[in-house]
From Swiss-Prot:
Listed name of the protein: Leucine--tRNA ligase
EC number: 6.1.1.4
Reaction(s) catalysed (UniProt annotation): tRNA(Leu) + L-leucine + ATP = L-leucyl-tRNA(Leu) + AMP + diphosphate
Protein's organism: Corynebacterium aurimucosum (strain ATCC 700975 / DSM 44827 / CIP 107346 / CN-1) (Corynebacterium nigricans)
InterPro entries in UniProt: aa-tRNA-synth_I_CS, Leu-tRNA-ligase, Leu_tRNA-synth_edit, M/V/L/I-tRNA-synth_anticd-bd, Methionyl/Leucyl_tRNA_Synth, Rossmann-like_a/b/a_fold, tRNAsynth_Ia_anticodon-bd, Val/Leu/Ile-tRNA-synth_edit
Motif 'HIGH' region per record, residues: 62-73
Family classification: Belongs to the class-I aminoacyl-tRNA synthetase family.
Region annotated Disordered, chain positions: 542-561
Positions with a binding annotation for ATP: K722
Subcellular location, record wording: Cytoplasm
Length: 949
């Protein structure tokens, strides 16, 4: 490789930095410097012994935005690259690459806005992102990079979907098993169907339906979040608390549709319990615990009109106080329980929503709440509802209690029905007060004439002929009433979860097609693996049919339905009936599909036989109990990304991975052993008097106020982005300062897990540090080495060894800001101590120490020191423990609490010795002459205080 600094100034300028960076990036590319070998398969290296120690480091799957990157985006990428480079220097085999999560709503919306096909815009965006990240010198293994939009990738997304589809969850074994094993058990009568029938007694069609009730993927007519403005349905997690779409902020309505669902609820306990095995931030664990929402209580049946209304309650001890039942307006029993006749004359008019007929009242009420979010429905101060005209029986006292629908009850939690105990629940109390319903005290301790009493207390008014819980505490009453409910056949103990099954379909174009076809009768059939991938057809009209955002009555019309030649196919599925006409599913998978398993494809990206060879997976993500303890779940060693993915991506990925583990395809129980949430780089933005954002770079500050074109503007602090006109491109910083400068600056800004403000004016500080580093090794006039062969002094050895020890510990613990601080401190020491040339033995290790965070300049210095090849795999410097302990320490000496001098004392000196040295100090002796020292205080290693009079 040619010397990048030939025929140019020898000062470390942005121009020289650019030459050095370009040359070394080309060297890394040409030599496959960051290629990590696998144990087996296409990426294995024959004749090479695989390092026993490995490190699998991963960034969260980025979406390739059309807007390109701003300087906030690379923060995590630089951090993981720094950590990866450090671990390579420890002799570990490091897997570090970056792919692109390119399917989904954002890419499609961008394509629609620009009028360009999403494949074209996506490929262009990926290329631009690769270009921008390439400037930073990130040490990725390019052979392992994938995009979720590559057919070679989504072939395996479809394959995994089929594995999940063809599986069921065995409650006894608490694991997924192939559906073929269930069929065998059903055929011999070892198991019955969900409703207790024998499989052999069923018709073929009934058998298919019975199996679908077990599958981990199933079609369901269920209430979904319909967003007319986007023309698609959304998962609960994609809807904001205000009832708007996360993408585009459009209104979202509740609607019954037939959709693919994934039975993630089967894994509720494992998803919850296995959080304890993970090295994750407690905040993220808490968010997942709350989302899964496990609670213990009882399921109780209220008989009504030939049906059982099942309700879940954590307080079955209050059953005697249940005065009415409330169903969610979308509950499946509402229409069946509606009275077919008009309301009786004596029905309270407050119960009828202004109508004489229950059916009309329910229809009007449903329409009135269609646009309300779940949060609005739960927090709504005004309690509303409709009486169905029918009654349910309270199972503990036989009382006939009215059945209502009300928006504060949701289908997404529990059974979608509640027993209302107004005396002891605030919302029930408010509802009962508004509607004039009875309020019966069953827990002593409060004044229910004023408000609901929601604390624990002794049971009162709670007895029948065979049950008496009066006088019992809450726990005792619950322990007594549940067995009674079970004996009577009207209830049972139950654990309930907030977690709902995962809505797994979108009415869009830009997503993975389902490997499913339907016959003329609408029956679904999985396609054989030999037909994968089912490629997304190229269509001219890829736009979804969107509607007026407020049109709640609209229905989805997927764009793929327009591709008739693709939809209608002649296939022989090997069912014994020969070729038939089938119809492809015109929905696509949600944008979370590819990111639910991509970490496994990074391991084996070119394998055509399987998504990831088990031996390769075991090496890179398998449990390592000797290193991480007996309960190590395995997984990626370090996963870095934002906390915003705590519930969505991370929960879905854990679910998919656990199914693959149960089926024997992976050895690790969890996808990610360690999670680290990086903070964000934020910036100031400015708005004029109209509230319009103005370019931040053109705003001037005068006397604490901010001006744009002479007009005063308002300053606000938060995100960085093009829409806020405060975006700074990494391209510009790399051009004006150099990539290493950008890397050092971003790592120095503060702890990695906290957010920090961007300030372009401060970047020069990182540049000056690298210039001082360069001058320690290179003569700026001649370009030759400026170091000497002098031996290191004791002081040099202390500074060097302490820097090595401190920097190593900081790298290991991702304290990258203090890494930079320690390196700056050491460079400053050498600069001051050796203005005319520092010893080579002091500077050469510095190139190794700085290499993870500023790799280009480190490579160049290493080469200038006469080394061949790359610094990447040079061993990280070792330190000598003896230089980490001081022989002497400096101790401040106070007189009456004020520091008057500082003295050097032996590090292990006792109080008498230290005080004696302090008193002998010339300055202290002068100040205490002729005075009485009445007290001597010594805080070991910290200070001496002499109290004198």
């Amino acid at each position: 490789m040619t010397n990048p600094s030939d025929n140019t100034t020898h000062r470390y300028t942005p121009e020289l930095a650019a030459q050095i960076e370009s040359a070394w990036q080309q060297y890394w590319k040409d030599n496959g410097t960051f290629n990590a070998p696998n144990p087996v398969g296409p990426l294995a290296e024959e004749g090479k012994e695989l390092p026993a120690e490995k490190m699998n480091i991963q960034d969260m799957f980025p979406y390739p935005s059309g807007a390109g990157l701003h300087v906030g985006h690379p923060l995590g990428y630089i951090a993981t690259d720094t950590y990866a480079r450090f671990n390579r220097m420890l002799g570990k085999n490091v897997l570090h690459t970056l792919g692109y999560d390119a399917f989904g709503l954002p890419a499609e919306q961008y394509a629609i806005q620009t009028g360009t096909h999403p494949r074209t815009t996506t490929e262009a965006n990926i290329n631009n992102m690769r270009r921008q990240l390439g400037m930073l010198g990130l040490g990725h293994d390019p052979r392992r990079s994938v995009a979720s939009t590559d057919p070679e990738f989504y072939k395996w997304t479809q394959w995994i979907f089929l594995q999940i589809y063809n599986s069921w969850f065995d409650e006894e074994q608490q694991k997924a098993r192939p559906i073929s094993e269930l069929i065998k058990e059903l055929e011999v009568g070892k198991r019955t169907t969900k409703d207790g029938r024998y499989y052999a007694d069923l018709t073929k069609e009934e058998q298919r339906q019975a199996l679908d009730e077990f599958r981990l993927v199933y079609l369901s007519n269920s209430t979904v979040n319909w967003c007319p403005g986007l023309g698609t349905v959304l998962a609960n997690e994609e809807v904001t608390a205000e009832g708007k779409s996360e993408r585009g902020n459009f209104p979202v309505f509740r609607k019954n549709l037939r959709q693919w669902m994934m039975r993630i609820t089967a894994y509720s306990d494992r998803l919850l319990d296995d959080l304890e095995l993970l090295d994750w931030p407690e905040k993220v664990k808490s968010m997942q615990r709350n989302w899964i929402g496990r609670s213990r209580g009882a399921e109780v049946s209220f008989h009504a009109e030939g049906y059982n209304i099942d309700v879940f309650t954590t307080r079955p001890d209050t059953l005697f106080g249940a005065e009415y039942v409330v169903l969610a307006p979308e509950h499946e029993l509402v229409d069946a329980l509606l009275s077919p006749i008009p309301y009786e004359d004596d029905v309270d008019k407050r119960w009828t929503f202004g109508h004489d007929d229950p059916k009309e009242a329910v229809e009007a009420y449903r329409a009135s709440i269609a646009a309300k979010s779940d949060l609005e429905r739960q927090e709504n101060k005004e309690k509303t509802g409709v009486f169905l005209g029918t009654y349910a029986t309270n199972p503990v006292n036989g009382k006939q209690i009215p059945i209502f629908i009300a928006d504060y009850v949701l289908t997404g939690y529990g059974t979608g029905a509640i027993m209302a105990v107004p005396a002891h629940d605030t919302r029930d109390y408010e509802f009962a007060t508004v509607f004039g319903l009875p309020i019966t005290e069953v827990v002593a301790g409060g004044d229910i004439t004023k408000e609901a009493y929601t604390e624990s207390g002794q049971a009162v008014n709670s007895a029948n002929d065979s049950l008496d819980i009066n006088g019992m505490s809450k726990d005792e009453a619950i322990a007594t009433i549940i067995p009674w409910l079970e004996e009577q056949g009207v209830g049972r103990e139950k654990i309930q979860y907030k977690l709902r099954d995962w809505l797994f379909a979108r009415q869009r174009y830009w997503g993975e097609p389902f490997p499913i076809v339907y016959d003329e009768a609408g029956q679904a059939y999985p396609l054989p693996e030999s037909m994968l991938p089912i490629e997304l057809p190229e269509v001219e009209d890829y736009k979804p049919v969107s509607f007026d955002p407020d049109d709640a009555d609209s229905s989805p019309q997927p764009p793929l339905a327009k591709a008739r030649e693709w939809v209608e196919v002649e296939l022989d599925l090997g069912l014994g009936d020969g070729p038939k006409t089938y119809y492809r599913d015109t929905n696509v998978m949600p944008q979370w599909a590819g990111s639910s398993w991509y970490q496994l494809r990074y391991i084996d990206p070119t394998n055509d036989e399987i998504f990831c060879d088990l031996e390769n997976e075991r090496y890179w993500t398998g449990p390592r109990t000797e290193e991480h303890g007996a309960n190590d779940p395995g997984g990626v060693d370090l996963y870095v990304g934002g906390v915003e993915h705590a519930v969505l991506h991370l929960l879905y990925a854990r679910f998919w991975h656990k199914v693959l583990f149960d089926l024997g395809y992976v050895s690790s129980k969890e996808p990610y052993r360690r999670l680290y949430n990086q903070g964000y780089i934020q910036a100031y933005a400015y708005t004029d008097s109209r509230g319009v954002y103005v370019p931040a770079a053109e705003v001037e500050e005068k006397d604490g106020k901010f001006y744009y074109n002479g007009e005063e503007v308002n300053q606000e602090y938060g995100k960085m982005g093009k829409s806020l006109k405060n975006s700074v491109a990494p391209d510009d910083i790399c051009r004006d300062y150099g990539a290493d400068t950008l890397r050092v600056y971003e790592m120095s800004m503060g702890p990695l897990d906290t957010s920090r403000p961007w300030a372009t004016k401060d970047v020069v500080g990182a540049q000056r540090f690298l210039q001082r580093l360069w001058r320690l090794a290179i003569d700026e006039n001649s370009g030759e080495l400026s170091t000497t062969d002098a031996e290191l002094s004791e002081d040099d050895l202390k500074h060097l060894n302490r820097t090595i020890a401190g920097v190593r510990d900081d790298y290991e613990n991702l304290r990258l800001n203090t890494v930079v601080a320690k390196l700056i401190e050491y460079v400053n020491y050498l600069t001051k101590a050796y203005p005319k040339g520092a010893p080579r033995a002091a500077v050469e290790p510095l190139a190794q120490l700085v290499s993870p965070v500023a790799p280009h300049i480190a490579e160049e210095l290493w080469k200038r020191f006469g080394h061949e090849g790359t610094i990447t795999y040079e061993a990280f410097p070792e330190f000598d423990e003896k230089y980490l302990v001081d022989d002497e320490i400096e101790v401040p000496v106070q007189i009456n609490g004020k520091v008057k001098a500082r003295v050097m004392v032996p590090a292990d000196a006792d109080q008498a010795t230290v005080v004696g040295i302090a008193k002998d100090d010339e300055r202290i002796a002068e100040l205490t002459a002729g005075k009485n020292v009445v007290k001597e205080i010594y805080v070991p290693g910290r200070m001496v205080n002499l109290v004198v009079k």
